[in-house]
Regions:
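Vicinal oxygen chelate
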Residues: 6-9, 29-108
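Non-catalytic surface loops within mature trypsin-like serine protease
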Residues: 12, 21, 46-48, 87-89, ...
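Short, structured secondary-structure boundary patches
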Residues: 18-23, 37-38, 84-91
Length: 108
């Protein structure tokens, strides 16, 4: 950690954020289940109850979502709760939980 970068504890994982002189804007997106998803994002998979609790907490804090908490691929393989937020440096973060943990890497 220094004046130019910081490490964040991200559910036991490390996100390293560096200051940059150029801004990263107009990121490319892809269409997924009715939403435009940032191609460049970091995701974490939580347990279903943990995801529900976090989304409720962030709602109470009036967090600005890029994509609000929702269920994606409902009643299909890969059913998941998901939401996207942006950190102060513009990094896109996805928080998700799968209805069935065995679906995490299944194609859907």
């Amino acid at each position: 950690e220094s004046r130019c970068w910081i490490d964040f504890n991200f559910y036991g994982h490390q996100i390293v954020a560096h200051l940059a002189t150029d801004e990263f804007k107009n990121l490319q997106t892809n269409f997924v289940d009715g939403e435009q998803i940032s191609c460049r994002h970091f995701g974490v998979i939580l347990g279903w109850k943990e995801w529900e609790g976090l989304s409720k907490k962030l709602n109470r804090l009036n967090v600005n979502y890029l994509i609000t908490p929702r269920i994606r691929f409902e009643n299909k393989v890969g059913e998941q709760g998901t939401f996207f937020i942006e950190d102060p440096s513009g990094n896109v973060l996805e928080f998700k939980a799968f209805k069935n943990d065995s679906d995490v890497f299944k194609k859907f």
